Amino acid sequence: MGEKMQFTELDQYLFGQGTHYDIYKKLGAHPTTQHRKKGVYFAVWAPNARYVSVIGDFNNWDNQANPMNRVGEIGVYEIFVPGAKVGDLYKFFIVGYHGEELYKADPYANEAELRPGTASRITDITDYKWKDTTWMKKRPEFDEKREPMAIYEVHPGSWKKHPAENEDDPGFYNYREFAHELAAYVKEMGYTHVELMGIAEHPFDGSWGYQVTGYYAPTSRYGTAQDFKYMVDYLHRNKIGVILDWVPAHFPKDAHGLANFDGTAVYEHEDRRQGEHPGGGTKIYNYGRPEVKNFLIANALYWIEECHVDGLRVDAVASMLYLDYGKKDGEWVANKYGDNKNLEAIEFFKHLNTVVLGRNHGTVMIAEESTAWPQVTGKAEDNGLGFSLKWNMGWMNDFLEYMKLDPYFRKGDHNKMTFSMTYAYSERYVLVISHDEVVHLKCSMLNKMPGYPDDKFKNLKAAYAFMIFHPGKKLLFMGQDFGQLREWSEERELDWYLLKEDNHKDLQNFVKTLFHMYKKYPALYAGDNDPEGFEWINADDADRSIFSLVRKSPTKRNNLLFVVNYTPVERPDYRVGVPKKKQYKLIMDEHGLLDKPKVFKAEAQECDHREFSFAYPLPAYGIAVFTY
């Protein structure tokens, strides 16, 4: 590469501090020109390596052709290779600390070879011309605390598939064609965001993308890095936000990956009790090492700033917070205070969220955290973790347990539907029905419901209606909005043919109506984090398994009264207490929106500990939405 050193002393200093937030512009492979020669600048961090070279299509994979130069004490190796070009495959050949020969994919690669290949591919991340200027200019104004979020969770490889040309053809859609079909569906259904699973490169389809080897590379299953950017771009131009699953909790042991990168524990802890999950499946990052923190934080920024992604859903946060997560005595090491809190991971989250959200207003960081860890969405300066939102796993578990019950036994578990309101304002929550709930013999949402087929559809409508009216953002996994019967499998597409059947099409239309109503009425989202925005009318009608509640708009206009009946018993003269002596317009029932609202006048008759009430016929599995 001549005398020109690209990884400067400032780069070394910032990387060593863990604060080189655009490190991905230096490490990795970057097409450039030096001494009037076109080529590629390569740089890799391998602090304990004895020898490093870059090998690839450009040098016939000769591990002696392009030895790299070590830069300073931090352990970065760099080289400029004339003639290397976009599209070439490459790896780093490393002679490790103990003399072993290692062939590693580039941790900072922006594109990868299609599996089962494990090489990295040279690409130019500056080469895409974005057209989402309107979205990106408005993005800083987005405030998840006061705006609707209806998230459609999608696994791109199994949403839809092309007919296979042969037994080895998985039938994947390219990112570009996927974008067009997905945008049309999401807009029609009323979702505001998509949350995409399995985007970062991973070797094994069956991991669903949760065992990542290419953190900076959109998986090549669906196309190139440019194709991925087009997908984000197109979704933005259709006013759809994009959230990615992000997996900083662990990484796999694959030989080409991060594990034992230079013959030593570079990215993971050296002590297996700290650096490995039980059973030997995956490695745990060393969150206390500045260069490792830098790798992860810069990766979050890469997706958000370079790829225009609007947020990250951070996987398995609980496994990072607890040193003994999933471990037995003797399998973990206590912190300096003698307890099980992972102090380095806690500081990592505070640092991550402060930097990402501080630099990118209008984006969201969402924690999948399954315990009662306090202040997950609290401010980092107040000793919180600094996330924007947290998945509400407690609500989900109680809600699903209740809905699975035979209606005649629901009265015994009535509190499962009300308990969540005792902690609803302790965090900023997303109500989730995710992929995890429709796999591993847990049944699809429709088949969780009790009764005959007609009963299942009625129960599921009532379930989704309650979800919309409960405080919190919403997330629904693909297929559950039209009543997918089979459990989800990454190997096949959704059973779209079911939409030819009336029950499934009717359910889909009902869910569509719910989400469009959710976006239309600020009462359903603007007060999610304000106790004044919600009021139970009757949370105690266990004998009849009926719930009634009010969602209030900050403007005091277009408040909503919601009543739902979770039994097949009709209540022809059901009386509900109301907050005020006003007219209440029935705008939606279990069939959908009414063509013409029905008006009910409150009268001076005490009910539900309120001075005023009115009566109306509540059908079996009935749903009623009134405005006032």
Locations of regions flagged by a protein language model:
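Carbohydrate-interacting/catalytic domains
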Residues: 1-148, 176-186, 190, 411, ...
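Short glycine-biased active-site loop of nucleotidyltransferases that positions the nucleotide triphosphate
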Residues: 69, 204-209, 253-260, 377, ...
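Short catalytic/ligand-binding loop motif for oxyanion handling, primarily in non-cytosolic enzymes
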Residues: 101-102, 160-162, 202-205, 250-253, ...
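Substrate-binding/active-site clefts of carbohydrate-active enzymes
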Residues: 113, 133-146, 155-341, 610, ...
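Short, flexible loop/turn elements at secondary-structure junctions
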Residues: 46-48, 72, 83, 155-160, ...
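A short acidic, glycine-rich active-site loop
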Residues: 217-221, 336-343, 452-454, 498-505
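Soluble or luminal CAZymes and related metallo-dependent hydrolases
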Residues: 174-178, 227, 291-296, 341-348, ...
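Conserved alpha/beta catalytic core and glycan-binding cleft of carbohydrate-active enzymes
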Residues: 308-310, 328-490, 519-529, 533-576, ...
